[in-house]
Amino acid sequence: EFESGLLTYTTGNSRVNDRFFLGSRKMRGFDAGGIGPRECSNRVCSTSNNDALGGENFAVARFEAEFPLGIPDEYGLSGGLFYDIGNLWSLTKINNNVLYEDGSWRQAIGASVFWKTPIGPLRFNFSDVLKKEQYDRDESFDLTISTRF
């Protein structure tokens, strides 16, 4: 699955609420807003001054395989493996406190457990980040609750 986005403006700059943000919903293995340009004091990011600014361009490719776990079907469990690669870049106006790398493609791999429950499908993702920037925020576990129509 491939997903991308591009913001363009004829006048002015993008606002932070218009920009794209990447995290576990689009790219597994990373925290919400965990990838992309950051506002950091003196171009040094720490846990207390590491605000995500979003980006005007993004691209993500997600590869996934789902398979049975070899247990009875009435349990509603299956497994999966995934590999995600993506990037978030570009800000129209940059000040000296913005830190980011334009061409740095982040990568994550992991395993998933899918569980069909009466409240809806649950998905447990266990991730390992293969490539990231020092200021990115990653996560090793993610739980997704879906609905069925």
Residue ranges and their predicted role:
Residues 65-68, 111-116:
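Short basic/hydrophobic patches in alpha-helices and adjacent helix-turn junctions
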Residues 1-77, 81-92, 97-98, 135, ...:
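C-terminal outer-membrane beta-barrel translocator/porin domains of Gram-negative envelope proteins
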Residues 71-73, 115-124:
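Repeated loop/turn-to-beta-strand initiation elements of outer-membrane beta-barrel proteins
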Residues 58-62, 106-110, 140:
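Transmembrane beta-barrel architecture of outer-membrane proteins
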Residues 113-120, 138-149:
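Outer-membrane beta-barrel "beta-signal"
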Residues 128-132:
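A short, acidic, flexible beta-alpha connecting loop/helix-capping segment that sits on the rim
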Residues 94-113:
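A short alpha/beta connector and helix-capping loop motif
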Residues 78-82, 121-127:
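Conserved active-site loop/cleft motifs that coordinate metal ions or position small ligands
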